[in-house]
Every structure is written in structure tokens, then in C-alpha cells.
Amino acid sequence: MLVSLSLSSLLTLFFIMLMASGISGLLFLHPRVPLSFVRIHIGILALPLLVSLLILANSGVSGNVGPWHLDSLACLMTFFVLAIGFIIQRFSVRYLMGDRSYRKYFTLFTFTTGAASMTWLSGDLRLMVLFWGATLVGLTLLIRLNSAWQVASEAAKISGRLFLLSWFSLFFAMMWLFHATGQWQLSLVVTNESLAGLGEWERTGIQLLIVLAVIIPAAQWPFQRWLVESIVAPTPVSAIMHAGLVNAGGIILTRFSPLFHGGIASIILLLLASISVLIGTGISLVQVDYKRQLVGSTIGQMGFMLIQCALGAYIAAIIHLILHGLFKATLFLQAGSAVGRHEVSTRTNERTSYLWVMAGRILSLVIGVAFWLTAPGDGYHLISALILGWSLSVSWDQLVAFGEGRIGRIAGLTVLGGAALVYFIIHHLFYKWLHTTIFQSVQPPMSAVMIVVCLLLFGSALGTWVARHRSSVFFAVLYLWLVRLGEAKPKSVESHPDYLKQYIS
């Protein structure tokens, strides 16, 4: 009773602090409020973040507090979104100083991250849909922040249309669930008793609606266009977009994981995500624009996350989306220093290097096979083993095989071993923390898993062949096709920002 009362009090305090940050953002809109108030606003933003950290520390006991659902996943994602939002807003204080939409930016940003945090705390399906819709509206307005620029307005229009389709898909899925189960409470909807009353066609229909609702924000093929167009948004907006919002699909699928049992919807999700991995990787390789490279990377990474969800590895998907969010936010915030020096590496001893390459190939194969044999009947383990072996091989080549002499190879081995150790520690801690909260669903048939494996192997083999035949016609066709996929539509491109003329005339 004491723990329940404590959590209830903390939740009340959290909402008070969240409202205070929202009021602070609205006050900052008034032109008479000095720009220096932004630092006070940043201080107020830290208050709900600190309270969410206290809730996270007390999330050992899960349960419902009114229409809100508190468990380790909800508390973790609330803290994560607010922490990323706080860091990016603090970064933006100087980065966007002088921008005509400076005040509006902080208000919209606070509104968007606040709505996202309340989405993951919602234990009522109606509140979840409402706050997720508010998050998508806030993101659309952030993309359209520079409304005087026709390109930004066009990008917001494209994003808004797709977001509307995604939101209606989620809305109809929740209405269907209520009609079938008679429950609005999330914890009651996903029980075995409630889901047992669903017919096979009803379950499949709801699954397909949820899949459509999550692949659009995740920018999966064929709905990746909005993320490509949104590159015109300010860099801090791109940072929160890629770090804390596009990965929402993994959280939604995790929440409704008991509904999925390896049927046709999971297979469709597997195929679309696998295709997106190949397309996203290709876009990131052919684009020369730094932000477009990151767009391609995000499409591919979200594809991997959804593959994990489709295979029932929801804890791995949550770990993936958190680490990806931290990594991608860092990459966007350091975009200003992305134009570095391109030094040609000199490899003094090619024979020695290729001996190390072969050693890395053998080591990667052994570790990948060993990882797979720990659970040979698990489809996720098979794909993970493939990705693990490939990642280790690439990292070995870059850090060890072509290291600068003995010292360089020792340093590379140290970095590689340290990174692996840190990853496994993080994976173990998150798994121990989340395994009681997250349901592990039935996996798709092994035939579907093998199709995904074949697609990934085909993509890897195609990339290797193309890299060695750059003068072929096929290379030119593939290259131009990937460039076209990664470029915005003509309406969303201007050779010069003509809207600036009105400010100098």
C-alpha cells in the first residue's frame, strides 16, 4: 500500500512538473518575455525529467494508477524520451539563436516530447491514441517550423498525410479491440481471456492495422518518403525525430505483443522490414549529404528493430531502439563537424593485413555459429548470429586487420573487446530488468525466417559484387535508383532559399 501510494504521489508530481514545463513553453512565446528566459525554461524542463527518474527507480512494482499504467517499460521510455528531449533543447539554446522561429521551436518541442512521454504511460487505449496523435501533430509542426519556406511546408504536408494514415490505422485497431474485448484498459485487453474471444480473422485484421500504424512512423518501405522529405527540418528536430519518435513502432508492438502469434501479419512485417534494411543501407552508402546518410541509416536500423519484433524478441528490440536513439541523437548534434579531413590510408604490408582479414573471417564465423548453437531452433538467434558475424567481420577489418602496425592492432583489439563487453553487460542488465514486463510471443514459421536470412545474405552478396564491378551497367542502374530513393521530390527542393529575399528587400 505504501509503495502504491508513493508511486501515485510521484505520478501526480510528474504531471504537475510536466504541466509547469508546458506553461513555461507557452510563456516563452510572448514577445515581451526576454530571450534569456530560455535558460529558466531549460531548468524547468529538468523537473519532470528528475521526477521520471524517481519513478523509474521505483518501477519494481507494476500496476495501474487510474488510467495510467506503470511498469518498467513505461517508466524507462518516459525517462528516455524526456532525457533526449532535454539534452537536445539544451543544445538548441545556442544552436538556433537568431532563428525567427526560436520561441515557437521550444514550445513545440516541449509539447511533442511531453505528449510522447504521456503516450507510453497511458494504460487506457483512448489516451494512448490521443497522446500519440498529439505527438504526431507536434512533429509535423516542427517539420513545418520555418513555414515561410515552401520546401518545409511541402515536407510537412507529405509527413502529415502519412501520419494521419498511421494514426487512423491505430485508432481503428483500438476501436476494433474494444468492440471485441469490451475493455479500454490495456492490461485487460492483452490478457489471454480477452484475446481468446477474438476470431482468427479479427486477430489478423487488428494485427495488420497495428503493423500499418507502426511501419509509417518507422519510415519503412514503401512509406519511407516522409523521412526523406523531412531532412529540411532544423537539425535538432531531426535529432529528436530519429532518436525518440521513429522508434515508437517497437514500443507499440511490444505493448501489443500478446496479440501477435506468428501469423500472416508477422510475416508481412518481416518482409517489409527486411526490404527496408536493404534499401536504407543502400541509401546511406550512395548519399553524399550527411543528413541523408543518417536517414538511410535510420530506415535500415528501424528495419532491424521491426525484424526483432516480428521474431518475438521484444526485449532485444527495446534495447536496440534505446541504443539507436542515443547514437543517432549524438550523430545529428555533431553534424556541424561532419565535414572532416579525408586522409588516404597507406597500408604498408598488404600480405600481413590480409592474413589478419582471414583470421577475422574465421573468428566471425566461429562466434556466429557458436551464438546460433545456443538456441538453434530460435529464428531470432539465427538472424542475430548472421548479423553478429557480419558486424564482427567488418569491425575487425577496420579496427584490427588494417591497423597501423602492432600498436594499432592492439588498440583495435582493445576497443573491439571493450565494446563487446559493454554491449553484453547492457544487454544482460536490460534483459534482467524488462523480462518480467515484456511478453515473448510465438515466432513466425522457420520458412519465413529463412526468407529473411536469404534476403539479408542476398543484399550482402550484391553489395560485395557491386563494389567489385563499379564499371558495370547494373552498378550504374542500382546506384541511380538508390540515389533517387534517397532524394526529395522536386517540389521539396530549391537550388536557393528564395523566401529569404523578403527579409532583405
From Swiss-Prot:
The chain crosses the membrane at residues 9-29, 37-57, 68-88, 105-123, 162-182, 204-224, 231-251, 259-279, 303-323, 355-375, 382-402, 410-430, 446-466. It is found in: Cell membrane. InterPro entries: ND/Mrp_TM (IPR001750), NU5C-like (IPR003945), Proton_antipo_N (IPR001516), Transporter_DabB (IPR046396). It is a multi-pass membrane protein. GO terms for cellular component: plasma membrane. GO terms for biological process: ATP synthesis coupled electron transport; electron transport coupled proton transport. Keywords: Cell membrane, Membrane, Transmembrane, Transmembrane helix, Transport. One of its GO terms (molecular function) is NADH dehydrogenase (ubiquinone) activity. Belongs to the inorganic carbon transporter (TC 9.A.2) DabB family. Forms a complex with DabA. Part of an energy-coupled inorganic carbon pump. PANTHER family: INORGANIC CARBON TRANSPORTER SUBUNIT DABB-RELATED, NADH-UBIQUINONE OXIDOREDUCTASE CHAIN 5. This is Probable inorganic carbon transporter subunit DabB. It comes from Bacillus subtilis (strain 168). The gene is dabB.
